[in-house]
């Protein structure tokens, strides 16, 4: 399987500060990569560098073999869809209007949305199962619904790579599950090639649930890259997070979870 996204010996930072270096990994079309690591480990800065919001300090980012260095913003927007953490918002757009903004790279900032743009937005809303929210006020929907709408906006861009910054942060358990299920479906595709997905989280269980690969960042370096089972081990969690955990298989399918040893002792 050929690489859709390739990161080669990447160094990244901002201002005068180098945050990370020597980072390399590949992700194929239809694969989900989970980015794990402690606070301050460089995840957000790495994302900004992948997206071209910060220039790389060294190394390369390639999409389908093409070096993205020097790409203009419009070309980047056609390759990368970005889903930030869902904030409360400030303007009373409808959900449909918010999703239509994802079509800007296809039409220009000052052009009216075309019939094709509206169709793409409607298709994204329906694919995420939120077509019923189309006329709702963006400021009056729940955090989980806003997160789904942001994913729909990125999907309307028709990107090749979807980047999500902690997509389940501040969501309740049910909405976390629904968002993760949708992310996995987008990678799997609907009768065709799925998206390449890169998402960050602080919850190793989410990597076990939906990721094909895990990149574990620690101190700006790639501590380990591989399958969730290869990366998320008791030894690596101790080394990177300074926490004793037990990685156990649960349920009929044997999905793995991390159990903090200290908390288990407190609970008897």
Residue ranges and their predicted role:
Residues 137-141, 145:
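Conserved ABC ATPase signature
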Residues 5, 19-22:
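Conserved structural motif at the start of ABC-family nucleotide-binding domains
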Residues 51:
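Helix-to-loop junction immediately C-terminal to a conserved catalytic motif
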Residues 240-268:
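ABC ATPase nucleotide-binding domains
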Residues 156-160:
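A short, proline-enriched helix->beta-strand linker immediately N-terminal to the Walker B motif
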Residues 59-67:
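Conserved ABC transporter NBD signature motif
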Residues 36-38:
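The feature captures the beta-strand-to-loop junction immediately N-terminal to the Walker
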């Amino acid at each position: 399987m050929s690489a859709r996204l390739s990161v080669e010996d990447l160094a990244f930072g901002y201002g005068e500060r180098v945050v990370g270096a020597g980072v390399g990994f590949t992700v194929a079309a239809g694969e989900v990569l989970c980015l794990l690591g402690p606070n301050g480990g460089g995840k957000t800065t790495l994302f900004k560098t992948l997206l071209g919001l910060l220039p790389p300090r060294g190394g390369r980012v390639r999409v389908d073999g093409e070096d993205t260095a020097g790409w203009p913003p419009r070309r980047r927007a056609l390759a990368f869809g970005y889903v930030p953490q869902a904030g409360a918002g400030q303007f009373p757009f409808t959900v449909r209007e918010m999703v239509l903004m994802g079509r800007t790279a296809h039409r220009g900032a000052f052009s009216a949305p075309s019939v094709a743009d509206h169709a793409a937005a409607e298709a994204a809303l329906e694919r995420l199962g939120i077509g019923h929210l189309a006329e709702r006020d963006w400021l009056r929907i729940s955090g989980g619904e806003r997160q789904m709408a942001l994913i729909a906006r990125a999907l309307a861009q028709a990107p090749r790579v979807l980047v999500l910054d902690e997509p389940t942060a501040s969501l309740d358990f049910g909405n976390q599950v629904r968002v993760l299920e949708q992310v996995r479906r987008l990678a799997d595709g609907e009768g065709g090639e799925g998206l390449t997905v890169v998402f960050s989280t602080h919850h190793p269980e989410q990597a076990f649930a939906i990721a094909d690969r895990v990149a574990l960042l620690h101190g700006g370096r790639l501590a380990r890259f591989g399958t969730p089972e290869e990366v998320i081990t008791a030894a690596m969690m101790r080394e990177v997070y300074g926490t004793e955990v037990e990685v156990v298989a649960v349920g009929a399918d044997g999905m793995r979870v991390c159990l903090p040893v200290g908390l288990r002792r407190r609970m008897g």
